[in-house]
């Protein structure tokens, strides 16, 4: 995201107004703090400028016919997160006997909804968190746990529509 996009995103999402120079400054500071990300962005930009139209997730899943730079930058990140979520869902299914009344009923973007009785809620929440962490950790770190820390948030609610 360039400085113009950052300004627009900050205003629309958070009501934060910033000048073009402030947006450029925040962007420079961000990349100075995360030089590896800056290097990756620069490399992806060069590849895109040379006509590179394919990206891959950490697991190797391909996205073809990339036309826009933002898609080239977003696809590997979002796709890798999706790969981790898919593995987490598989782990939930494999372990369904551990909490038989807890049933995954919905996946939307990065959210998983599990239905269960009130008595099982704490156990179902813990099992969901464990599966999510293990799935994403396996995708990001493989057999070597601990390189990229993984955190997830889960909550117990009466309905998915509850704020939180």
Describe each model-derived feature in a short phrase.
Residues 1-164:
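Conserved catalytic core of nucleotide polymerization and phosphodiester-bond processing enzymes
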